[in-house]
């Protein structure tokens, strides 16, 4: 359990300086952070599934877009409980995942704009699909060589 705790907090086997320890310190215990991660993640999945179910109701495109986006935001925010918000933001905007992060955040915004203000149902669905793809690409950036494997797989299917 201790090794899992060190890996999730980013303290593999290195000693941190006092400033880094103060900035990364969390007032929540590891068990509390793990519980809130699970709660937030489950809520995110629930909202996404609820939004998908609402898609089939008359006029449900707007509700689908809102709940699907809220679900994805909650699932993304759940990792803040594991790493801490500052460390999560630093990792999100590292060079390897900067483009994926920007596209993902723009898809969140454009999905809500298309559904709530522009009233363009097709555009809202398109942005939800792009949201799913960008979140997948963002998530793959945390797995070593996963993006390369997906690119090779897709290129071999297309050629």
Swiss-Prot record:
It comes from the Eukaryota. The gene is SFT2D1. May be involved in fusion of retrograde transport vesicles derived from an endocytic compartment with the Golgi complex. Pfam families: Got1. The chain crosses the membrane at residues 37-57, 63-83, 98-118, 123-143. InterPro entries: Vesicle_transpt_Got1/SFT2, Vesicle_transpt_SFT2. It comes from Homo sapiens (Human). It is a multi-pass membrane protein. The modification Phosphoserine is found at residue 9. The keyword NAD does not apply. One of its GO terms (biological process) is protein transport. Coiled coil: none annotated. It is found in: Membrane. One of its GO terms (cellular component) is cytoplasm. Residues 1-36, 84-97, 144-159 are cytoplasmic. Belongs to the SFT2 family. The lineage of its organism: Eukaryota, Metazoa, Chordata, Craniata, Vertebrata. This is Vesicle transport protein SFT2A. Residues 58-62, 119-122 are lumenal. Keywords: Membrane, Phosphoprotein, Protein transport, Transmembrane, Transmembrane helix, Transport.
